[in-house]
Regions:
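Carbohydrate-associated surface elements
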Residues: 168, 188
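Short hydrophobic beta-strand element within catalytic cores of glycosyltransferases
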Residues: 298-301, 311
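Short alpha-helical donor nucleotide-sugar binding micro-motif in glycosyltransferases
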Residues: 96, 260-261, 268-273
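Conserved donor-binding/catalytic core segment of Leloir-type glycosyltransferases
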Residues: 7, 163, 198-216, 222-225, ...
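Membrane-proximal helix-turn-helix segments that form the acceptor-binding/catalytic region
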Residues: 143-162
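Nucleotide-activated donor-binding/catalytic signature segment of Leloir-type glycosyltransferases, i.e.
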Residues: 245-264
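N-terminal subdomain of nucleotide-sugar transferases
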Residues: 1-56, 226
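Aromatic "clamp/platform" in nucleotide-sugar-dependent glycosyltransferases that forms part
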Residues: 281
Length: 321
């Protein structure tokens, strides 16, 4: 072979990369999106991406921007979790066998990638995302997420080299795999956020952006903003999730539910907000906090998560115990 082969097993935002997937895949995954573009100009490695998608019923292979994308069918997430991703793991392993990579780089523990990498006998590296075991310890979670946490613990123990986004995430991995060599490696922010100008709204306003479920502390946030003392502060909530309907019914007029919004709309709300609020009960390193900080927006958050490394309490925001 002329060049070493690198296989990267990760969720790709196919709708942002391929016009044929634009209406089928609306995920943003900004750190992977940025990495894909950063790798297009390198010539040292033959790069193969292995990614899962519900938008395909059979494997597809696409060559673009000096990289090869192997798109594999995802199928039912519930069935995958209950069967330890059996069929999906087989598909990934077959693809790895065809590629014969010199290095396997796995991203995340939520899908089948980390489990599929257990049997890989070459050099391998895991970039830890998810912290599912920690999430289950910190907030009520559905049965399937507890099952995912079980597969997380099983998979992580089989990796000797693991990168994490934050010291908080390193701590969570050490609880599962104390033998592993850990490196803290932050994920980047899309360049467009560095050039956003702040244009604060005339009246006080805050933004929350994320999944609407217990782990994000959204119940506490809504409870706080329904208090009369904050009736003059507008809270904009971007995102969807299991708690939205119940919490929206409890909301006062100063709480505005935006649902899912585009990247351009997110940037507009970040630009006009006085603060980003992120009351999480546990997060590896939320991208929204980094996006807020690179544009100079203060952040109010908790001490549970990797986001604390970007907030200096009392200077660039507040860290609530």
């Amino acid at each position: 072979r002329l060049r070493p082969v690198l296989a990267i097993a990760a969720d790709l935002p196919l709708g942002r990369l391929l016009t044929s997937f634009r209406n089928k895949d609306r995920r943003t995954i900004p750190w992977i999106f940025s990495l894909f573009h950063a790798l297009e100009s390198q010539e040292d490695f033959d790069i193969h991406w292995i990614t899962l998608s519900k938008a395909v019923s059979a494997p597809e292979t696409i060559r673009m921007r000096n990289q090869t994308i192997h798109i594999l069918p995802l199928g039912s997430m519930g069935r995958n979790i209950l069967t330890a991703h059996f069929l999906t793991v087989r598909r990934i392993r077959k693809t790895l066998n065809d590629i014969q990579p010199d290095l396997l780089h796995v991203w995340g523990v939520e899908q089948a990638y980390a489990l599929a990498g257990i049997a890989f006998r070459g050099k391998k590296l895991l970039s830890y995302q998810g912290a599912l075991t920690a999430y289950c310890q910190r907030a009520p979670q559905a049965f399937l997420l507890h099952m995912q946490a079980l597969w997380e613990r099983m998979a992580v123990k089989h990796y000797d080299l693991i990168t994490c986004e934050s010291p908080w995430a390193c701590g969570r991995v050490a609880e599962i795999a104390p033998h592993a060599r850990l490196s803290c490696m932050e994920y980047g922010v899309e360049p467009s956020f560095y050039h956003l100008a702040r244009k604060p709204s005339p009246e006080p306003s805050c933004l929350f952006a994320g999944t609407i479920y217990e782990l994000k502390g959204i119940s506490y946030l809504v409870e706080a903003f329904t208090h009369p003392s904050l009736s003059h502060v507008q809270l904009f909530i971007a995102g969807n999730g299991a708690l939205r309907e119940r919490l929206e019914a409890l909301s006062t007029p100063n709480i505005h539910w935006l649902g899912s919004i585009s990247r351009a709309e997110l940037q507009q709300h970040l630009s006009t907000a006085w603060f980003l609020v992120h009351p999480t009960l546990g997060d590896c390193c939320p991208n929204i906090v980094k996006e807020a900080r690179v544009m100079g927006l203060p952040v109010i958050t908790t001490e549970e998560g990797g986001q604390t490394q970007y907030v200096q309490d009392g200077v660039s925001g507040y860290i609530v115990p």
